[in-house]
From Swiss-Prot:
EC number(s) given by UniProt: 3.4.21.88
One Pfam short name: Peptidase_S24
Catalytic site positions: S127 (for autocatalytic cleavage activity), K165 (for autocatalytic cleavage activity)
Keywords attached to this entry: Autocatalytic cleavage, DNA damage, DNA repair, DNA replication, DNA-binding, Hydrolase, Repressor, SOS response, Transcription, Transcription regulation
Recorded catalytic activity of this chain's protein: Hydrolysis of Ala-|-Gly bond in repressor LexA
Domain of life: Bacteria
Gene Ontology biological process terms from the UniProt entry: DNA repair; DNA replication; negative regulation of DNA-templated transcription; proteolysis; SOS response
DNA-binding interval(s): 28-48
Originating organism: Lysinibacillus sphaericus (strain C3-41)
Molecular function as annotated in GO: DNA binding; serine-type endopeptidase activity
Function recorded in the entry: Represses a number of genes involved in the response to DNA damage (SOS response), including recA and lexA. In the presence of single-stranded DNA, RecA interacts with LexA causing an autocatalytic cleavage which disrupts the DNA-binding part of LexA, leading to derepression of the SOS regulon and eventually DNA repair.
Protein name (record): LexA repressor
Family designation: Belongs to the peptidase S24 family.
Marked site (Cleavage) residue numbers: A91, G92
Gene (UniProt): lexA
Length: 205
């Protein structure tokens, strides 16, 4: 990997942040202000070196035409965890959960630090569509036995049936609320939490 100076690292990070936030790169003046360089020619010099090292591409005919490149050698290897897909769970009426591991999915470790804390379930039904969870989606679930009001959870009823709903603890009962305005909530006296939905994976056919 080609080395860059601390100032060039700062410039590259600022360009990435601006593109991420605004959708377009900053001007030379904005770069200079961000990293403490008063001279535009000095900024141009750093940009030229970043371009020579393969980190950016510029179009000299346009004032903001800076394209961020990600050369293979500059990409830090991402830590991956393998999360088990343990079957299907309803997003409609509760059904008995299928808990056989079908396959493992590689996911970035931003979802968790220990593989045994996460699992995935395939959604059946349309009761969570207004939360963006569709029939056939795979939800990423962090194992936990408690939930806060409003969390989307995998809930197990007293009949050992599983469902994905938004959780609410209310006086004398629990409300498992669908995210579909045409469906009624499920009211139960007892419920156990299998985990909280923390992410979503969707196959595109």
């Amino acid at each position: 990997m080609k080395k860059v100076s601390k100032r060039q690292e700062d410039i590259l990070a600022f360009i990435k942040d601006e593109v991420r936030a605004k959708g377009y790169p900053p001007s030379v003046r904005e770069i200079g202000e961000a990293v403490g360089l008063a001279s535009s020619s000095t900024v141009h010099g750093h940009l030229a070196r970043l371009e020579q090292k393969g980190f950016i591409r510029r179009d000299p005919t346009k004032p903001r035409a800076i394209e961020i490149l990600e050369p293979e050698e500059s990409i830090q290897k991402q830590h991956v965890i393998h999360v088990p897909l343990v079957g299907k769970v309803t997003a409609g009426s509760p059904i008995t959960a299928i808990e056989n591991i079908e396959e493992y999915f590689p996911l970035p470790d931003t979802y968790g630090t220990s593989e045994d804390q996460l699992f995935m379930l395939e959604i059946m039904g349309e009761s969570m569509i207004e939360a963006g969870i569709l029939d056939g989606d795979l939800v990423i679930v962090k194992q936990k036995s408690t939930a806060n009001n409003g969390d989307i959870v995998v809930a197990m009823t007293a009949e050992d049936e599983a469902t994905v709903k938004r959780f609410f603890k209310e006086k004398n009962h629990f409300r498992l609320q669908p995210e579909n305005s045409s469906m009624e909530p499920i009211i139960v006296d007892q419920v156990s939490i299998g985990g909280q939905v923390v992410g979503l994976y969707r196959r595109v056919h």
